């Protein structure tokens, strides 16, 4: 069963378009990486300068646009790449896009049959994280992947729900992996 929220459409394209419009004032400057949820210091603050105090009457210029699937993931920025985790129908996709052009550099995909117990969007529910040349994602069914940042090739994966016998819960798994000191930390379950 696939809900309408998991099909590509106007809202996801609009969401990415708004993000790109917000980044437009910074085009030509080297933006800081935003390698995981809440940014470089995990505090939601950006050190960038030169933000517009007010948008032009016609709105900010659109750099490019891309149709994307559903989910709750935020976009991660690393080395001029946008890393996006999204779902189209019954497939989860991790995409690397060139931040300047929107051109897809690679895509890693895998099937999912996860459905939210209460009919909300079926995910993914958390952002990717980039650390030391790897992209880490945790899907709503509890599959943790590590992909090579430059190619998107799978380095390894683990089904943490199966390995640790975690019962299904309200939201599935939905916490962005935390990578520090060469170790990956994941919230394995909860309410």
Give the role of each language-model region.
Residues 2-16:
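Bacterial N-terminal signal peptides that target proteins for export
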Residues 28-191:
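Noncatalytic, solvent-exposed loop/strand surfaces
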């Amino acid at each position: 069963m696939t809900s309408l929220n998991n099909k590509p459409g106007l809202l996801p394209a609009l969401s990415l378009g708004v993000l790109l419009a917000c980044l437009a004032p910074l085009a030509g400057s080297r933006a800081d990486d935003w390698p995981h949820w809440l940014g470089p210091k995990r505090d939601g603050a950006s050190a960038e300068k030169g933000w517009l105090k007010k948008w032009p009457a016609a709105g900010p210029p659109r750099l490019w646009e891309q149709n994307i699937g559903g989910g709750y993931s935020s976009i991660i920025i690393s080395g001029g790449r946008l890393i996006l985790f999204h779902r189209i129908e019954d497939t989860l996709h991790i995409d690397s896009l060139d931040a300047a052009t929107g051109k897809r550099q690679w895509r890693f995909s895998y099937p999912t049959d996860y459905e939210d117990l209460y009919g909300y969007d079926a995910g993914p529910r958390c952002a990717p994280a980039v650390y030391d040349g790897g992209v880490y994602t945790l899907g709503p069914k509890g599959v943790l992947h590590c992909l090579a940042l430059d190619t998107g090739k799978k380095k390894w994966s683990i089904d943490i729900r199966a390995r640790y016998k975690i019962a299904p819960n309200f939201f599935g798994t939905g916490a962005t992996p935390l990578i520090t000191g060469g170790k990956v930390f994941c919230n394995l379950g909860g309410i």
